[in-house]
C-alpha cells in the first residue's frame, strides 16, 4: 500500500515538472514576442514528452578521464533528494507527517550540494568544476538566511511541524505580519535553486553549462528534472510558510486547489523574474547575502524572540 501511495505521489510531481519546462518556454516566448514550442502536438503540448523520449533514448556518454561511480551517482542523488523533499509537505495531508518537517527539508536541501560537487569534480573538466564550486558556495551561503528565516517562523508557529503552520494561519497569512522575511525568503529560494538572476553556475558566456556541462542524455535529464522539482518544492514551501492554505473543514478538496494555485502563481513569478532581470555579478550575489540579508534576518529573528517575552505570551502551538 505504501508503494502505491509513493507512486501516486511521485508520478504527478514528475508530470508537473515535465510540463513546467513547457510553461517556462511558452512564458519566455510570449515575453520575447514569439510563440515558443508549437509544433509537437496541439499548441506544443506534447513537447515535454518528445524531449523526454529523445533524452532517455540517447546513448549516455561520459568523458574518458571521468570518475565513473561519482559521475553516475551524482544525477541519481540529485533527483532522489529533489523528490524526497516533497514527502513532509502538507497538501493538505503529507505522505509522511514528520514532527521535524522544517528541519528535514532544510537538511535535504543542504545534501543537494553533494550531487552538484560530485558532478563537477567527477567530470574532470575545468568548466564543470568552476560551476560546481560556484553552486556550492552560493547554496551554502543562502542556506544561512533560509535557516534563520525558518527559525523565526518556527518561533511564531511554536512547532517544527508543517501542518501546524496551516492552523497558525487560519485567521491571517504570515506574509502580512512578516513581509520582510517573506521577501528575503523568496529571493533566497531563487539563489538556492540557482535560478536567474542568480544562475552564476550556468553562465553560458564563461562556463558553457556549468556543473553539468559533460552530461548528456538520461543523466542530464535527471539533473534537469531535479532542478525543476526543487523549484516547485521551494514554491510549495513558500505557499505553506507565508500564504497559509485557506483551511476549510467542510470543503477539504478546496484546500488542495488553493495550495496548487498559490504554488503555480509563485512559480510563474520565478519565470517572470528570469525574463526580466539580468544576471548578477558573483561578488554582488555574495554582498547581497552577507552584507544585507544576514544582518536583517538576525535582527528580525531577535525581534520575534523578544515579542513573546515582552508581551508575556506563547506561540499558538506550544
Curated annotation (Swiss-Prot):
Catalysed transformations (reactions): a ubiquinone + NADH + 5 H(+)(in) = a ubiquinol + NAD(+) + 4 H(+)(out)
Annotated EC: 7.1.1.2
GO biological process, one term: mitochondrial respiratory chain complex I assembly
InterPro entries referenced in this protein's UniProt entry, alphabetically: NADH_UbQ_OxRdtase_su1/FPO, NADH_UbQ_OxRdtase_su1_CS
PROSITE patterns: COMPLEX1_ND1_1 (PS00667), COMPLEX1_ND1_2 (PS00668)
Top EC group: translocase
Presence of keyword Nucleus: no
Topology with respect to the bilayer: Multi-pass membrane protein
Keyword Cell wall biogenesis/degradation: no
Keywords, ordered alphabetically: Electron transport, Membrane, Mitochondrion, Mitochondrion inner membrane, NAD, Respiratory chain, Translocase, Transmembrane, Transmembrane helix, Transport, Ubiquinone
Complex formation: Core subunit of respiratory chain NADH dehydrogenase (Complex I) which is composed of 45 different subunits.
Function: Core subunit of the mitochondrial membrane respiratory chain NADH dehydrogenase (Complex I) which catalyzes electron transfer from NADH through the respiratory chain, using ubiquinone as an electron acceptor. Essential for the catalytic activity and assembly of complex I.
Family classification: Belongs to the complex I subunit 1 family.
Name used for this protein in its record: NADH-ubiquinone oxidoreductase chain 1
Organism, as annotated: Osphranter robustus (Wallaroo)
Gene: MT-ND1
Amino acid at each position: 500500500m505504501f508503494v502505491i501511495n509513493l507512486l501516486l505521489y511521485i508520478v504527478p510531481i514528475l508530470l508537473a515538472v515535465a510540463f513546467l519546462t513547457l510553461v517556462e518556454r511558452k512564458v519566455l516566448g510570449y515575453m520575447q514576442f514569439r510563440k515558443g514550442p508549437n509544433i509537437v502536438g496541439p499548441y506544443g503540448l506534447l513537447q515535454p514528452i518528445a524531449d523526454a523520449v529523445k533524452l532517455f533514448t540517447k546513448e549516455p556518454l561520459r568523458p574518458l578521464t571521468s570518475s565513473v561511480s561519482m559521475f553516475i551517482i551524482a544525477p541519481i542523488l540529485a533527483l532522489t533528494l529533489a523528490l524526497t523533499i516533497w514527502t513532509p509537505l502538507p497538501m493538505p495531508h503529507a505522505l509522511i507527517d514528520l514532527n521535524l518537517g522544517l528541519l528535514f527539508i532544510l537538511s535535504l536541501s543542504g545534501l543537494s550540494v553533494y550531487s552538484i560537487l560530485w558532478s563537477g569534480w567527477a567530470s574532470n573538466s575545468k568548466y564543470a568544476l568552476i560551476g560546481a564550486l560556484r553552486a556550492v558556495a552560493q547554496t551554502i551561503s543562502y542556506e544561512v538566511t533560509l535557516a534563520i528565516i525558518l527559525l523565526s517562523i518556527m518561533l511564531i508557529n511554536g512547532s517544527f511541524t508543517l501542518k501546524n503552520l496551516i492552523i497558525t494561519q487560519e485567521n491571517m497569512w504570515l506574509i502580512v505580519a512578516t513581509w520582510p522575511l517573506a521577501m528575503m525568503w523568496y529571493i533566497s529560494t531563487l539563489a538556492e535553486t540557482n535560478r536567474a538572476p542568480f544562475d552564476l553556475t550556468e553562465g553560458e558566456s564563461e562556463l558553457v553549462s556549468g556543473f553539468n556541462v559533460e552530461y548528456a542524455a538520461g543523466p542530464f535529464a535527471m539533473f534537469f528534472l531535479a532542478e525543476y522539482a526543487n523549484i516547485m518544492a521551494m514554491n510549495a514551501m513558500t505557499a505553506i510558510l507565508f500564504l497559509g492554505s485557506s483551511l476549510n473543514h467542510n470543503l477539504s478538496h478546496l484546500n488542495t486547489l488553493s495550495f496548487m494555485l498559490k504554488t503555480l502563481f509563485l512559480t510563474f513569478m520565478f519565470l517572470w523574474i528570469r525574463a526580466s532581470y539580468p544576471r548578477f555579478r558573483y561578488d554582488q550575489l555574495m554582498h547581497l547575502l552577507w552584507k544585507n540579508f544576514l544582518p536583517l534576518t538576525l535582527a528580525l529573528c531577535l525581534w520575534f524572540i523578544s515579542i513573546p517575552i515582552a508581551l508575556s505570551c506563547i506561540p499558538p502551538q506550544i
